[in-house]
Amino acid sequence: MIAGCNSMSNIDIPDLTLTDNTSQRLPCVLLIDGSGSMSGQPIDELNAGLKVLEDELKKDDIASQRVQLLVIKFSGDRDVEVLCDWTDAMSFSAPHVTANGLTPMGEAVRLALVKLEEQKARYRANGIAYNRPWVFLITDGQPTDDDWEQAADQSRSAEQAGKLIFFGIGAGGDVDLGKLARFSSRQPVKLQGLKFKELFLWLSRSTSSASKAAQGTNVQLPPPSDWMQVSA
């Protein structure tokens, strides 16, 4: 577990981050592709982007108290690892992501859905208001687990029920945007080159705006033109 990241997972244990800080929360899940194809410059740029996210959120007094981050890496065969459990942005330390193995994307999405419901139960138990959770899935390939379609259906159903907002981000020339689109009614988008820093800067600004919105209201997000590839 990375220093500065919360390792608490049992909802029966009092969570000091919620009793000490009773601010409304915006839960944000980052699902990070750590497969072998991300090795080299892609994973280096992604790690630099995570550091940008950490630094920018900590500069914002309100967002640093309200945005909660969960970082999950998927790689190996069916290896899904929580790199950073639910942590307020003020205490978030960007994890160092390494690259190896395959792309068990479905397994990561299933874990994210479970942990989101657990965290919402914590919020309710502590009287904490929260905005609709955000889930960001970043990949340069396609799912390699056999039952990924079931996870995609679960994600789409949760989104349609208003339980989350899902963003699919594809990087590199080998990403399968068609399969990524199965996880959400929102169309996935393509990263320009390796502009992970620009992506995470946009994410920090977007979550900052959303964290200040009243519960249940819509938020105008900044344009993603700095990092999103526009189809010809």
Question: Where are the regions that the model predicts?
Answer:
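Acidic, low-complexity intrinsically disordered regions
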Residues: 1-232
